[in-house]
Amino acid sequence: MLFTLSILSTLLFSTSISAIEITQNRVDHGTITTSIGDITIDSGAYWSIIDNSISTFIGNLDIKSNAGLYISSTISNLPLLVLLNSGSASITNDGIVSLDARTSTQGSSQFNLVGGSFENNGEFYLAASGAIPMTMGLTGKSWNNNGLIVAYQNERSSGSVKFGVIGQTITNKGQICLTNQVYQQTSKIDGSGCVTAKKNASIYISNVLDPQSVSTEQNYFLADDKSSIITQAVGFNTQVINVFGFGNGNKIGLTLPLKSGNGGQAYSYDSDSGVLSLSSGLFGQKFNIGPGYDSKLFSIVTDNSEGIPSVNNGAVSYSGPVPSQKSLPSACNVECKPVPNAPDDGSSSSSSVVSSTTSTASTDSASLSSTSGEESSASTTTTESSETSNTSSNASETNGSSTESETTGSATTSEASETINSSESSETSGASETSQSTGTSESSETESSVTESSETDSITATTSDTTSSGNDNSSVTSSSDASTDSITSETASSSSTPLSGDSSQVSSLTTGTSPDTIASFQTDSTSFGFGSGSPSSGAVQSSGVTNSTPNTGDVNTQSNTANIATSDNTATSTASNDTGVNTATATTTGTGTGPDNNNNNNNNNNNNNNNNNNNNNNNNNNTNNSGVSAADSKASGDISTVTASSTTLISVASVSSTYPIANESSSPSSSSSSSSSSSGTPGEVIPNANGSSKLSIGMTFMISGFATMFALFM
C-alpha cells in the first residue's frame, strides 16, 4: 500500500475528457487548453477565449441558437492559430462563431477547421489584420451554409479563404461576405446563395474546368468599385456565371491576357441576354451581368490585386454606373455585418459541465484528487473565520468552560461543484474578567484543504477552556480515513494567555498513515503537555492546556528566571510531512498583563516568584490558575493510542539560547526535573512521549529521509 501511495504521489492529475458543455457565460484569458473533446455551448451562453495563442479542437463543435463562441487576440504580436483536424468531427453553428485576429499585426494567424461536416445556420466570422498574409479555411466533406459567413481583413493581402474540399461540392444558400479578402473557390458550388465582394475584395474561381462547377442559381455580387471576379482560363467554358453589381470601375477577368482569337473578339456583350463574354484565344468564359450596359463604356484593363493571378490586360472594366434593370436576389440583400467584439468581463470565469470517460487518481505532497463523471474544478474544505466570544463572569469560581463541536463532512468526486466545509471557531477570542487581570487571546485562522480520491470523514473538534487567570482555546482538526488509500490531514491550533509570569503551554498530537514531524519554535517560556480526551477515528480531542499537574508522559518544561511584570508569549508549532499530505499546525499567540503568579506547590520547595511550574506528581494548589480537570491523568493512555498508529517526532527549537528548553527525566516522578536543574539543550528531539533519548535536528532530517525512502520502495 505504501508503494502504491508513493507511486501515486509522483503522478500528475490526468483525465480523459470526452465533452464539455458551456451552460453560462464564460471568459478565459491567456493560455488554456481547448483539446477537450466535444464542445457544446447552450442557448443563452457564450464562451469567450481571449489571447490564447493556439486553440486546437479535437471533437465536435456545437453552438446552439442564441449562443456564441469567441476566440480573439488583443495583443499585436500574438497571432491566433485556431485548428480543428478531425475527419469525423462536425461543426454546427446556430448562433455566433467569431475568430478575430484583427489586432495581431506582427504575426501570421491561421484559421483552419477541417472536419467531416460543416453547417452554418447562424453567423460565422473569420477576421484578421491583413498585415501579414494568412490562410482561412472551413473544410468538410459535407458543407452547408444557410446563414452568414464573413471573411474580413483590415487591409488586403495575398492571403485567401477557402471553403469545402477540392473536387467536392459545397452548398451555399446563405450569404458569404468578403472584405479586403480573396475567396478562392476550389470546390464545386451549389445552391441559390450569394458571395459578396466589397471593399477591395476578389472572387477567384479556379475550378471552371468542370462545366458544372458553379450552379446556375449561385450568385456573385461586386458591391463596390474596388471589387473584382476572376476565373481560371482552362478552356472555352459554355457555363454562365451570374454576376451582379458590375460597374463603376470594378473588374471581371481571366487568368490569361484578353485577346482576339479563333475568329472572336477579346470581349463581347450581348445586350439582349445580358451576357459578357471574355476570351483569350481558345480560352474563354461567359458572365451574366444583366441588361442595360453601354458597350462603349467597356475597356480592357489589368487587375493587379493581391492574392490572385495578375496578368496584363486580363480583365474588363465598366466605367459607367451599374444599370438598374437587374435586381439583386434575396440572398445578396442579407446585410454583411461587422465583426462583433468578443465579450470581456475583465476577469476569468467558468461555468461549464464536463463529462469524462476515464480518470487517473494522483497526488502531490499536499492533496489527492480524482475526477469521475463530471468536472470537479475544485473540491476544497475551507475553514471560515468566525469570532466566538467566551466570557467568564464568575472567574473566581470557574474551573473551566469548554465548548466542543464536531463537524463531519465528506468529500466526494461525483458532483461537479466546489465543496466548502466551514468550521466555525477557527478564529476565537475569549475574555475573562477577574479581580486582578484581564486576558484575551485570539487564535489564528487555520485553513486546511483536503481532497481525497475516496470517501473521507472529516471531523473538526474545537475545545475552549476558560480558567480564572486566562483563556486557553484549543482547536484540533483531524481527518480520519474511510479507506486505506485516503490520506489524513490534521490541524491543531491552540491559543493561551496566562497571567504575567505564566508559561504558555501548547499541546499537539498528529496521527496519520505516514510519519509526521512537528517543529516547535518558541520565543519565551513554553512547556509541553498532553490534554486528556478519547480519540475517535484517529482524531485527538483536548480538554484544555494544563499548567499545574503534569501528565505521566514526557513533559518539556521551561521556566523564566527573571521577574517579569508583562509577558508576551508566542509559540508556533508546525508539522509537515514531505511524503504525505498530513499537515498539522499549532499556533499559540497570547498576551498577558498582570502581577506575577505564585504557583504554591505544597509538595515542592521551589519558590520562584515569577514562574514556579513544578509539575511532577504533586498536588498543585494554584491561587490564580485552577483549571485542570481530573481527566488529564488519562493523557498517557491517549498518547499510547496515538503513537501506536504513527511515529510522531516533536522538534523543539528555541529562539533564545539563554533559556533551557527541555528537561530529560527517565522517571516521570523525578523531582529533579525542575527549572533550576534543567539539562535540556536547544534543538533537542523528543521521540513520542517517553523522554528516553535525545536526537539532534540533523538526525531528525535523516530519519525523515529514511522514512520517505522506505515508503517509496516498500
Swiss-Prot record:
Q: How does it sit in the membrane?
A: Lipid-anchor; GPI-anchor
Record's keyword terms, sorted:
Cell wall, Glycoprotein, GPI-anchor, Lipoprotein, Membrane, Secreted, Signal, Virulence
A GO term from the CC aspect: side of membrane
Biased composition range(s): Polar residues: 320-330, 505-519, 545-558
Annotated InterPro entries? Hyphal-reg_cell_wall_N
Glycosylated residues: list them.
N200, N390, N394, N399, N421, N473, N577, N621, N624, N663, N690
Q: Which residues form the signal peptide?
A: 1-19
As for subcellular location, the record says: Secreted, Cell wall; Membrane
Question: What the entry says about post-translational processing?
Answer: The GPI-anchor is attached to the protein in the endoplasmic reticulum and serves to target the protein to the cell surface. There, the glucosamine-inositol phospholipid moiety is cleaved off and the GPI-modified mannoprotein is covalently attached via its lipidless GPI glycan remnant to the 1,6-beta-glucan of the outer cell wall layer.
State the conditions that upregulate or repress this gene: Expression is down-regulated in absence of GOA1.
- Judging by the UniProt lineage, the source's domain of life is Eukaryota
Q: Where is it predominantly found?
A: secreted
Propeptide ranges are 691-714
Please give the sites of covalent lipid attachment annotated as GPI-anchor amidated asparagine.
N690
Compositionally biased intervals (Low complexity): 346-504, 520-544, 559-590, 597-625, 665-679
Give the function comment from the record: GPI-anchored cell wall protein involved in cell wall organization, hyphal growth, as well as in host-fungal interaction and virulence.
Family named by the database record: Belongs to the HYR1/IFF family.
Q: What name has this protein been given in UniProt?
A: Cell wall protein IFF7
Look up and give the organism this protein is from. Candida albicans (strain SC5314 / ATCC MYA-2876) (Yeast)
